Amino acid sequence: MATAARLLPKIQSPASPAVAEARRRRPSSLRLGVTSGPARTLKQKLVAKSAVSVVEGENAFDGVKQDTRPIIVIDNYDSFTYNLCQYMGEVGANFEVYRNDDITVEEIKKISPRGILISPGPGTPQDSGISLQTVQDLGPSTPLFGVCMGLQCIGEAFGGKVVRSPYGVVHGKGSLVHYEEKLDGTLFSGLPNPFQAGRYHSLVIEKDSFPHDALEITAWTDDGLIMAARHRKYKHIQGVQFHPESIITTEGRLMVKNFIKIIEGYEALNCLP
């Protein structure tokens, strides 16, 4: 089992040039989740719009518990983040979005979110602002879903090593992903096996040094790359290497709905309101 001693030091390296450029390009008007001012109104409108779009369309709210406490989305300066938010809105989830350098872990803790979603993003886990520290400090007590960069943060937080993929960069590639059907309560409940997933990455969690004592591999590609993992003890910490929100991924909405169910299961187990 992983212990606190196994976690990596909370050291954030300076952003790489690619990450700095991505941050420079992002318009400041997308700052959501602040506590006052026009941006807060924008955040509220986005949440409402995401929820209303489903009320007028599909019945995606069915079976999903409504809760006023938000899911915190940590935006690692990635254009896919708001597609993930749209999926959460479609299943009736209340969420707030913060860039990875616009909020502290302590501030997130004070919000007491139902769950945390760590988005994709450029660079390595060291370029992800508070994302790595969030996994370390809040993951054990808060359901957490890491996507692409988010999974890599989970891997590093619990002793894994993030390396260049031996098969090079993939961008918008559809791959068959296989998952372990014997495991209950994963992001893949009810999905066909295998299913097609959209991949956009050059880094992976290294298989040879994978921290099997802390994490378990839950999905993989035909060539053996790790596509998903979860914590052995804190089973509410899960992540995927591919992009559920990509149009290439056939079952992305169901994975997001499964994350909400993981949150609900955690709340029931711990007698949370």
UniProtKB/Swiss-Prot annotation:
PROSITE patterns in the record: GATASE_TYPE_1
Positions bound to L-glutamine: G121, P122, G123, Q152, S202, L203
A Gene Ontology term for the protein's cellular component: chloroplast
Residue ranges of every copy of the Glutamine amidotransferase type-1 domain listed in the record: 70-269
SUPFAM superfamilies, A to Z: Class I glutamine amidotransferase-like (SSF52317)
Induction line: By chitin oligosaccharide elicitor and the phytopathogenic fungus Bipolaris oryzae.
Reactions it catalyzes: chorismate + L-glutamine = anthranilate + pyruvate + L-glutamate + H(+)
Main location (coarse class): plastid
Residue span of the annotated presequence: 1-47
Subcellular location: Plastid, Chloroplast
Domain of life where this protein originates: Eukaryota
InterPro entries per the UniProt record, alphabetical: Anth_synth/Amidotransfase, Class_I_gatase-like, GATASE, TrpG/PapA_dom
Positions of the UniProt region annotated as Disordered: 15-35
UniProt keyword annotations, A-Z: Amino-acid biosynthesis, Aromatic amino acid biosynthesis, Chloroplast, Glutamine amidotransferase, Lyase, Plastid, Transit peptide, Tryptophan biosynthesis
Gene3D superfamilies: 3.40.50.880
Enzyme Commission number: 4.1.3.27
GO-annotated biological processes: L-tryptophan biosynthetic process
A Pfam family that the UniProt record links to this protein: GATase
Residue positions of the active site: C148, H243, E245
Involved pathway(s): Amino-acid biosynthesis; L-tryptophan biosynthesis; L-tryptophan from chorismate: step 1/5
UniProt tissue specificity: Expressed in roots and leaves.
NCBIfam families: trpG_papA (TIGR00566)
Subunit text: Heterotetramer consisting of two non-identical subunits: a beta subunit and a large alpha subunit.
Function summary: Part of a heterotetrameric complex that catalyzes the two-step biosynthesis of anthranilate, an intermediate in the biosynthesis of L-tryptophan. In the first step, the glutamine-binding beta subunit of anthranilate synthase (AS) provides the glutamine amidotransferase activity which generates ammonia as a substrate that, along with chorismate, is used in the second step, catalyzed by the large alpha subunit of AS to produce anthranilate.
PANTHER family membership: MULTIFUNCTIONAL TRYPTOPHAN BIOSYNTHESIS PROTEIN, MULTIFUNCTIONAL TRYPTOPHAN BIOSYNTHESIS PROTEIN-RELATED
Protein name, entry field: Anthranilate synthase beta subunit 2, chloroplastic
Species this chain originates from: Oryza sativa subsp. japonica (Rice)
Lineage: Eukaryota, Viridiplantae, Streptophyta, Embryophyta, Tracheophyta
